């Protein structure tokens, strides 16, 4: 979970780079958003999910963090290794999660699609659209995943987003205080 000082650091950097809005999406928790408010911040959370055989991350932007409908997806406590967190908290009901994100006033976006184990990303995205997906993270540091995933590129993901008229988002996928 991000703490107030980390939110402060990230927001300061965002302002220095001239951003008007940013979302800080911690994994499976919105506790930071409940403790910290700023006009530059768009609420968000990154959910660990399984959809079929594919492990993925689903971003929820613009949600009401006080809406109890999303509580069942939130990590109660972050301890142990990241794989323990994934194993314990990853939801397997993505259609219900997307519906609940919408009920909480948000949009559902597939995060860093090059990390998905879907061999046919287009087909996988179409399945997600059929259960309510709103967008896809097109712009993010693909090079972070290059050693493992070589078959999805920014161009491929952008083409899929255009084909299905999805909202295109971008992110840093940072896991520390330095956003750029």
Please annotate each region the language model reported.
Residues 30-134:
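Extended substrate/RNA-proximal surfaces in nucleic-acid metabolism proteins
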Residues 25-31, 115-120, 144-152:
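Acidic-and-aromatic substrate-binding clefts and catalytic sites of carbohydrate-active enzymes
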